[in-house]
Amino acid sequence: MKHIPVLEDGPWKTVCVKELNGLKKLKRKGKEPVRRANGYKTFRLDLEAPELGATVSTTAATNGLRDRTQPFPIATPVPASVAPAVPPGGGTDTAREFRGIRAPEVSDARKRGFALGTVGPGLPTPPPPPASQSLAPGDPEAHSFREQALRPRILLCAPPARPTQSAPLAPPAAPQESPVRPAPPTRPGESSYSSISHVIYNNHPDSSASPRKRPGEATAASTEIKALQQTRRLLANARERTRVHTISAAFEALRKQVPCYSYGQKLSKLAILRIACNYILSLARLADLDYSADHSNLSFSECVQRCTRTLQAEGRAKKRKE
């Protein structure tokens, strides 16, 4: 077991100051430097002190936070009878008292949102009411005047409004109907993306009015169209088949009425028509009638020969085809 060194046995190891990058001396914060707002000095304000310096500092702080476009108001001179008498050596004590006692109140006001960066260029600050010369510093009316002077600080914490347009307003023109509905007015703290999305949504028509259909609807419609086309095609084929069968039956009935070599002989529709024409002319000649196109007044024997030549030519044509 190791021997535990005792204080008297040897010197203790010292800590090197260089390794710790030097000992830093803790400094207490002194008085804060005077801050400037828009080129004017701002001082801490005593909310309860009735001195004239409080009123002047309130006016300076309020005027410093105003819009730069507004002219700086001229300070109203206060007569000597109203201003309190300040001892020659009391100015320094009063300033120290302001720093020591009123610093928590000022820091609390900063925490509540009183900062120079929150003031927007488009948010004017109402000017404080002018100080009345007839009011004494210790009166309750003077205390209410100081409260009214502090109201602009509370108003400055409101959210910034929209930036105003620098161009002059044009005279009102005649109302014109626009296809796009106007966007609803947005609140000061609302993002501008809502108005943009509203305009984009209004520019595009509804999905129900669009000619495009959903994939399921398109498939169902195409199936119905194909079924309808197939039904129409089947009906047309049936009508054509019925027509051909009717014509074939009529020619077959006519063929049975004209002379031929045998009833089992196959004749074309054209041959049946020619034989039928010559047969009708032959019957007309028997009745002393002339049905010929050129009125050639053919004899009965000539009509019979035409029928015979037509039958022989049709028979030879059938044999060549076979």
Curated annotation (Swiss-Prot):
Tell me the classification of the organism that encodes this protein.
Eukaryota, Metazoa, Chordata, Craniata, Vertebrata
Basic and acidic residues bias locations: 101-111
* Primary location class: nucleus
Q: Name one Pfam family in it.
A: HLH
Task: Please give the residue ranges the record annotates as the region Helix-loop-helix motif.
Answer: 245-283
Query: Which cellular component terms (GO) are annotated to the entry?
Result: cytoplasm; nuclear speck; nucleus
Q: Localized where?
A: Nucleus; Nucleus speckle; Cytoplasm
Q: What is this protein called?
A: Transcription factor Atoh8
Cystine crosslinks: none
Question: What ranges does the record give for the region Basic motif, renumbered to this chain?
Answer: 231-244
Know anything about its domains from the record?
A: The bHLH domain mediates transcriptional repression by inhibiting TCF3 transcriptional activity through heterodimerization.
Domain bHLH: start-end pairs: 231-283
> Which Gene3D superfamilies has this protein been placed in?
Helix-loop-helix DNA-binding domain (4.10.280.10)
Which biological processes are named by the entry's GO terms? Answer: cell differentiation; formation of primary germ layer; myoblast proliferation; negative regulation of DNA-templated transcription; negative regulation of endothelial cell proliferation; negative regulation of gene expression; nervous system development; positive regulation of DNA-templated transcription
- CDD domains in the record: bHLH_TS_ATOH8
